């Protein structure tokens, strides 16, 4: 009995201790989790640099690391400031860090910096060097004056009858990036663009928008790796003037022009009554290349509205298109803004129904030009709607007297049918380019202008002061460039 009673007391005491350890004074349970294990230390096990096979001004640094999430390269040349690449993922334990924008013939050293939950760690130093430019690109010179906005200027150059180059040069005129594409037939320069997905697209082909010859756009990564080709679906030919990619994945869409050729009566514009000419179609393609939207100029436009004169010999049918679109962009509401050079017209088209929303300029102009001493534009290029809703375009000025090229910004009031000139820039001395050209409003508020037919680029402030200029020459002569377009970064899309 005594032993039994003693056991009961001991058990009660034990129960009291156990229960008391799991209760607080206010009756709420307190659970004390075990301390987390310390994060595992980030370790870089190897780094190695290699040349880029498509671009002597680029390199690649391979890194293998443990317990790291991401890595970047800090690098520089002797006596120069340290630069940094964007970070890349190390989720798989290894990655290749692209290094872009190197200077020809310069040696660099750098360290890989890896990041993880335990902090960051740096590798031993690794060396690499930029090579020489290809011989064809060594014929290119860019002379600059002034100080331009940060970033690079893109230009597409067909050189030596053998290679089409996508080139980026900095504000000092040094070529800092390129990608070459070999060809065996004559090439026309076309649209070169950095898309919002960070990749670049370049037109490869001989057409200028009317010839019965094949062509396509090639999409390639900043490293130069070719990703895919994009073309108008059969039976259309692919036009060289514009490609814009929007969205991603299943929502990705490609916006471009195609064209076909038909026998037409050109007598209303002084040509033969039966000649084969080209007419264009606005296309929106799905990721698989099928058409989601088509809008044919043959159905909506008239040959008799062709106001830019055809070539001296209208029977040279391989060179004729009556509409000649050269810009395709999206308005703030998602509808299309199209520039038709040969019609002297900018058109807004409903991107779903295909209905014409308005027509500015040309024979079917629906607007009154206000405060514009030249009462409109002609042979225009690069029409874009700005974030404030204004229309910015490059006015080639073929129909001005005297002929002069300028950049114009209009405030549009579709309800009142007015286009009010709110800003323009005319170069001093005057520059006239009958063909090609580009204009961009930069993040700084400055405007970048590409006088492509003259191989000249200008950046101007809002008050019209020239901040920077560049002259691009090949073998000492001005080079024809379809567009001279600014980008903010070689690695990823960034507003310039």
Q: For each of these PLM feature ranges, what is it?
A:
Residues 1-11:
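Bacterial N-terminal signal peptides that target proteins for export
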Residues 12-16:
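Hydrophobic helical h-region of N-terminal Sec-dependent signal peptides
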Residues 17-49:
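Bacterial Sec-dependent N-terminal signal peptides
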Residues 40-43, 50-55, 107, 113-496:
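Histidine-/acidic-rich catalytic cores in large beta-rich domains
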Residues 55-61:
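Structural beta-strand segments of beta-rich domains
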Residues 62-64, 89, 98-101, 127-129:
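Generic structural detector for well-ordered beta-strands
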Residues 65-70:
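Short proline/glycine-enriched turn/loop motifs at strand-loop junctions of beta-rich domains
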Residues 72-105, 117:
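Recognizes extended acidic, P/S/T-rich segments that occur
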